[in-house]
Amino acid sequence: MYLTKEQIDSTAHLTSRQAARKLNVGKTSINKYRRHYAQYGDLKLPENARVLIIDIESKPLTGYFWGLWKQNIGTSQIIDSGGMMCFAAKWLGSDEIIFSSEFSDGHRDMVYKVWGLLDEADMVVTYNGDRYDIKRINNEFLKEGFTPPSPFKSIDLYKTNKVRFDLPSKKLDYIAELTGSGNKLKHQGFDLWVGCMEGDPEAWQTMQEYNEQDVLLTERVYIKLLPWLTNIPHMGMFSGNGTACPYCGVDSLVDDGRTTKTHVQEYTLYQCTNCDGWSRGNKPIGEKLESRTVR
């Protein structure tokens, strides 16, 4: 259930439990929206698009090798080719985080669950997912004999980070902390993966918390980067609203009299009061400049 800023503000004097009873929602929802409005203000999220945030964790390959330096390992030396061991996902703006692993569900059921989510999604948001997560997930579909899910638009925030900024680090943890979105969960390092591969329940609990935190960070960074995105579809098409903001899909564009110019034409410039994204009209102002010169 979506809660407006006015609803949350009306319960500011109440505890989370009391506010949950008043608004007939779970306490988790109250806490989530209080954090959301404290951080983002009255930012509205697209309601008609199915936007999936996802992150996977993989186990390493195991095999026979003769040393630690400059080894060429053939396919005949591979014992186990590794692959996806778990994933965490959530729908943008939802309270629920979906987690599945080999340990809790078995490999095939885990793969089936992630296939169903991707098949339902209009957009899939990842951090470095075009190079890693999506391809690794496709590996599992191929191994299990699944056909591809229905097409979706991939939004890789790593690419936005790389194209738009020149930060000292391209890691999710860095841009998440920089934007006030939080930090990755600290853990014991590679020993965590070893514990999971050995079936240690405590290791799997930590892995789940780590995986779920990455999904939350990815969602928060997505919201922070909304006005910077260059590879996002026009969000207005999901609601059928041609005047909606292309970035967030909310009908909140403002024309303050400014224009933007291409090489030979001029267009009205708009800014969204919800996400602050800039866009331009699709109808030129005045006549196209007829020039006898080129460059």
PLM region spans:
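Short, amphipathic alpha-helical "recognition" segments used to contact nucleic acids or chromatin
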Residues: M1-T15
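Short alpha-helical "recognition helix" segments of helix-turn-helix
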Residues: Q18-L23
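Short, solvent-exposed alpha-helical "recognition" segments
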Residues: I30-P46
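Conserved RNase H-like, two-metal-ion catalytic cores of nucleic-acid enzymes
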Residues: K44-L118
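Conserved DEDDh/DEDDy metal-dependent 3′-5′ exonuclease domain
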Residues: G93-L178
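Acidic, Mg2+-coordinating catalytic module of metal-dependent nucleases/exonucleases
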Residues: V125, Y174-S239
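Short, cysteine/histidine-rich loop/knuckle motifs that typically chelate Zn2+
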Residues: P246-V250, N274
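Short metal-binding segments enriched for Cys and/or His
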Residues: L269-R295
